[in-house]
Design a protein with these regions (language model features):
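Domain-level signal for soluble alpha/beta catalytic cores
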Residues: 1-238, 243-250
């Protein structure tokens, strides 16, 4: 019978821990009145940043973004802005969007990320637009990445688009993620020889307790073994929560 390689019960060195950088998401937001957002004398609003060469820039907020609900509620979804510029902007916008994304990828690598997670789900409600955004993001980040990419989405079609665009130069990608509600996503793991994140979610929602988590993950591990997916390509997200959420997590 096949045995699984597992992480130690006690993580006491950096070598026992695998960090996935999850900042390059269209969901990420900054407060408009926060210290990272700047308004120039001419009224231009944006996020100051330095590219990987150390040159200063301002990721300015396009006018149409100012009509969105997050902006009106005091937030700037800065990676959404960068991705929009990269996909739809003029030449200057495209360069600015790419530099913003690249500097964040570089920053996360320096901090020890072993995978760079990319998610574009909130870019649009339109699937074709989401796929286009994922293609652009993967191709932009992989030009500079020295660690593999993690392709993250709630939609398997978007994940497939990202995996297809990835060149594998930095190593096999990570599919983030597979749960009981979409076991068929493991087909993509086989097709692209990727790593995979298995989550402890139930087929119809969040698990109630540790026993249900173990049961859910066990069923998923069985599916990976049926497909011949090597244990060292499999990672587990137990969906752990702080005790402040519920006493069940204590």
């Amino acid at each position: 019978s096949e045995t699984l390689t597992v992480m130690p019960r006690v993580i006491n060195t950096a070598n026992n821990y695998i960090a996935i950088g999850e900042n390059i998401h269209a969901t990420r937001a900054l407060r408009r009145d926060g210290k990272r957002v700047e308004t120039l004398a001419d009224g231009t609003e944006g996020v100051p940043f330095k590219d990987i060469q150390g040159e200063s820039h301002l990721l300015n907020v396009p006018e149409h973004f100012k009509k969105t609900q997050p902006y009106e509620q005091g937030q700037i979804k800065h990676f959404m802005v960068a991705i929009w510029k990269g996909v739809h902007g003029n030449a200057d916008d495209q360069e600015q969007g790419a530099k913003y994304v690249v500097q964040e990828a570089h920053r996360q690598e320096k901090a020890g990320a072993r995978f760079l997670d990319l998610n574009v789900d909130e870019v649009s409600y339109d699937l074709a637009e989401q796929k286009r955004a994922m293609q652009w993001l993967v191709k932009t980040v992989q030009k500079v990445a020295t660690v593999p990419l993690s392709i993250d989405s709630s939609n398997s079609e978007i994940i497939a688009e990202g995996l297809a665009a990835y060149d594998n130069v930095a190593g096999p990608p990570l599919l983030n993620s597979v749960a009981l509600e979409r076991v068929d996503a493991l087909d993509l793991v086989e097709r692209y020889n990727s790593h995979v994140m298995l989550t402890a979610a139930s087929a119809d929602g969040m698990p109630e307790d540790a026993e249900e988590r173990l049961e859910n993950v066990g069923r998923l591990i069985e599916e990976t073994m049926k497909r011949g997916i090597e244990p060292d390509r499999v990672y587990i997200d137990p969906l752990a929560f702080p005790i402040s959420v519920s006493k069940e997590y204590g």
